[in-house]
Amino acid sequence: MSRTLYDKVWDDHVIDRHLVHEVTSPQAFEGLRNASRRVRRPDCTLATVDHNIPTTTRKKFKSITTFIDEADSRTQCETLETNVKEFELTYFGMEDSRQGIVHVIGPEQGFTLPGTTVVCGDSHTSTHGAFGALAFGIGTSEVEHVLATQTLLQKKSKNMRVCVEGELTPGVTSKDVALHVIGLIGTAGGTRCVIEFCGSAIASLSMEARMSICNMSIEGGARAGMIAPDEITFEYLRGRPLAPEGAEWDKAVQYWKSLKSDPNAKYDIDVKIAASDIAPTITWGTSPQDVAPITANVPDPSSVSDPARKAAMERALEYIGLVPNTPLEEVKIDKAFIGSCTNSRIEDLRSAASIVKGKHIADWVYAMVVPGSGLVKRQAEREGLDKVFTDAGFDWREAGCSMCLGMNPDQLSPGERCASTSNRNFEGRQGAGGRTHLMSPAMAAAAAIRGYLTDVRKFSSTPMVPRSPPPKFQTIQPKVEDEAAHKQAADQADPVTDCPPAGSPVNKGAPVASAMPAFTTLKGVAAPLAISNVDTDMIIPKQFLKTIKRTGLGSALFYGLRYDPATGAEKPDFVLNQPAYRSSKILVCTGPNFGCGSSREHAPWAFNDFGIRCIIATSFADIFFNNCFKNGMLPIILSQEQVDTLAKYATQKAEIEVDLVHQKIRYPGGEIPFDXMIEEFRKHCLVNGLDDIGLTMQKDSAIEKFEAKRTSTWPWLDGKAYKGKATKVTAIGSASQPAKKLDW
């Protein structure tokens, strides 16, 4: 039977790699601690701090405690450091040159490999699919599940193919390809799918350009994005610290070459795009699907016939502060941000530097460049890119997520407009009231110079899209300024936080069988909500993510809609502030694609804490849908007609009953069955309040059997310290000795 790339990885693997950061992990480690469980595979787990940390200079850095001023951010970072020590995990802290954004450090270390399954409590884990890996974001409950069992309960997605044929024109980059695709399919176009990107335009791209495309696949609604590995992939990985070596390398490459879709493989959805149709592209609204070529005008909602789409456009334009039919090149900006897990790698910085060299940013613009890792920063400085940027008036920063989302000091002020290389332009994403326009690094650089959204093709140094792998080792061999000091630091390195311990998988304590309240029936007045693409930033803004607990977030639910930003007073018109709906346990949303955006489990936690345990909509984003079940909540998908019927009764304040046992929704004068919408296992767990980690741990013998098969078949997937394999933290070479690779 012919299989796709996704089919092959799905059939062969469980969970091979787990990346951990400070925002979505505290509650997971607390769950392990409370259940007396250990991390099953420390050798397959890598942790770092990235979301909360400042990107200011670290020349005087001593510790997280003294460096991070904001209390909640500091607590999350300190908690991660405590947890990695207690659970014996590899950790790249702020004093480590290898620290950076999780989706940058994984590939540059060779932790990400073709054919692996990669997970992280971050929706942009899809980045790693550029290597032919199946990589997807997970919620905190699933983070805990992977830590405890190195497995996940998953339903297979559909296969979707996006084929881009032809040659990209000058000035068009992989970011433009990604935005163009999202504009075509919409933010829900890839829902329940894994997208395989292929075609001559994709095959010509460098690994870093491919990562940008796969990174954005989540914004098209997909569970993951994948690109088949090839010689460009192998050359990128060769010699990376955690890539296989010698005979194992040869065996790995032989396997990796088989990771491509068979000629007659079937796809559920097939999209074909001509590369010549793609122009430098930006967003104009508050959703990644709100895109247009830079040469276009702001769209006019009056030209749209669909009422829901028209309303969404009007809302977006009101927030973003644009007038229909205005040329996009006449839109003035206040800030420019080059960074994020989408566009902070060395090729991105080279592309932007080629535009700004010898020029200066507009007088009214603040512009910043934030490298994706300490190693990228060092490489850029060796190439003199930092000087190019600072001479042009840019701020040169340390590695971190920075202004991609306003969880750290790098934020927009209300009303400020930013040309950004990040991945989301949701309301308030970069700061409360901030206005975000997504674009490529070259486009952001051009906007910073001119002070307006700008067609990069008008600049003399128009960069071509990268088409070849970067020079060998360029981002993994940082120069050692002080060899003696470095050797001393390596000798004194904490063996717990710098390398995983030798030994077999460890689990302590009996499995805990029940951790959730049972869900059988809910009855009451449902709250109606008529908004499309309700995203996770709308459900719970980023400033409320700085918690190490699962509780106390009910007051933050729909914060921007419920409260006046100036006074903090309730907005009486918002549905959950109205007396009839203050105690609603059911929410009925008439718009599609509910819960799109981040993998943050804080969204269902906020609903649960408010008291809402059932959400009814026409469609849900995949990660939010899964996260609901992990928290004893029931998301129900119905037709538009059925949802509209329930919304009508909700508006009339009539009671609705959701009966999960019999899988029916009852309302005055009728009922709606939802038999086919809930899988039997999920129903069983909800009705009985079962903890699926405990259920999985009952399959320990099956997990051990798979691990033995993996060690035999794909030995390079075991960590360097697994079951007594030799491991040593090595120093980086000096001028008098050949440089050694960074190791764990």
Swiss-Prot record:
**What highest taxon heads this organism's lineage?**
Eukaryota
Residues that, per the record, bind [4Fe-4S] cluster:
341, 401, 404
InterPro entries for the chain:
3-IsopropMal_deHydase_lsu, 3-IsopropMal_deHydase_ssu, 3-IsopropMal_deHydtase_ssu/lsu, Acnase/IPM_dHydase_lsu_aba_1/3, Acoase/IPM_deHydtase_lsu_aba, Aconitase/3IPM_dehydase_swvl, Aconitase_4Fe-4S_BS, Aconitase_4Fe-4S_dom
Q: Please name the GO terms of the biological process aspect recorded for this protein, alphabetically.
A: L-leucine biosynthetic process
Iron-sulfur in keyword set: yes
**Cofactor(s), by name:** [4Fe-4S] cluster
What EC number(s) would the UniProt record show? 4.2.1.33
Q: Which reaction does it catalyse?
A: (2R,3S)-3-isopropylmalate = (2S)-2-isopropylmalate
Self-association state and partner proteins as the record states: Monomer.
Q: What does this protein do?
A: Catalyzes the isomerization between 2-isopropylmalate and 3-isopropylmalate, via the formation of 2-isopropylmaleate.
What is the protein named? 3-isopropylmalate dehydratase
Species name: Phycomyces blakesleeanus (strain ATCC 8743b / DSM 1359 / FGSC 10004 / NBRC 33097 / NRRL 1555)
Gene name tied to this protein: leu1
